[in-house]
From Swiss-Prot:
GO terms for cellular component: cytoplasm. It catalyses: Endonucleolytic cleavage to 5'-phosphomonoester. This is Ribonuclease H. The keyword Disulfide bond does not apply. Belongs to the RNase H family. Its main location: cytoplasm.
Amino acid sequence: MNSKVVIYTDGACAGNPGPGGWGALLKFNDASKEIFGYELDTTNNRMEITAAFEALKILKKSCNVEIYTDSKYLQQGITAWIHNWIKNNWCKSNNEPVKNADLWQKLYAELSKHTIIWKWVKGHANNSGNIAADKLAVQGRETAIEVLKCRG
């Protein structure tokens, strides 16, 4: 029987593009794990996708996963749009390349390892898991800003 894991993800960016961070809260039974990271020059959408990918990547065995995101871009991209993107060789219906295809492909590769339900949650609306993921993403973003300051 697969274990159940609940994941909350978020991304944050100072400017778009600009320094950004991603964060995720993973809950399993009574345990939880917080992860975050950053990129020096990125977009909010890239950070949203990265948060989900990094959270799934650390799961060591097949799990039943509920992923909560406040990003409609992430939720709709991975549950609806991606099927046509794959069919159209990572192009949209207007033949333009899909933005962030590199990250969508990495995230898609993780999907087959788990049974996943994607859920949208309103951001900044008193959802404790979303608030925790947001704080982690902001921590990542602030780390990126500090790294840039140190580089002058």
